[in-house]
């Protein structure tokens, strides 16, 4: 629908709001969570999943034509053209290691500072973050 337009870029607004922050963060809209017991027993599978997830994100960025057709085929959106138009504004990214920890801890701190209940009343310690084998 050509009459639709973007009125607010949330990623840009977040970045602008973070310019003066003590700990800069990025807008985080999706994470992978793994139980510590599962990670200890199946770390190789977790690393394989993360590597394939990173490759999927790279593919989506590098080949939006094919990615949008797959998005339509999976029923995520009804038309590939809609997916292709939307992809550049989705801020799809893969972060791991220290980059992920910095971005996510800053994001959680920004939420906590506004309303501690939004993070369960506390900020997670270093054990919360998996900064293992996958690197981007």
State where each predicted segment sits:
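An extracytoplasmic/periplasmic, membrane-proximal ligand-sensing/linker region
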Residues: 65-136
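Pocket-lining segment of extracytoplasmic ligand-binding domains
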Residues: 1-70
């Amino acid at each position: 629908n050509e009459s639709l337009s973007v009125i607010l870029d949330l990623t840009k607004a977040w970045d602008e709001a973070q310019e003066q922050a003590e700990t800069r963060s990025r807008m985080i809209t999706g994470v992978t969570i793994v139980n510590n017991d599962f990670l200890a027993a199946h770390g190789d599978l977790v690393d394989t999943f993360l590597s394939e997830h990173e490759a999927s994100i790279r593919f989506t960025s590098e080949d939006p034509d094919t990615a949008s057709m797959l998005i339509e085929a999976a029923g995520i959106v009804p038309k590939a053209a809609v997916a292709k138009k939307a992809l550049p504004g989705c801020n799809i990214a893969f972060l791991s290691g220290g980059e992920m920890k910095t971005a996510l801890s800053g994001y959680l701190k920004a939420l906590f500072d506004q309303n501690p209940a939004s993070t369960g009343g506390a900020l997670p310690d270093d054990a919360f973050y998996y900064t293992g084998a996958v690197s981007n």
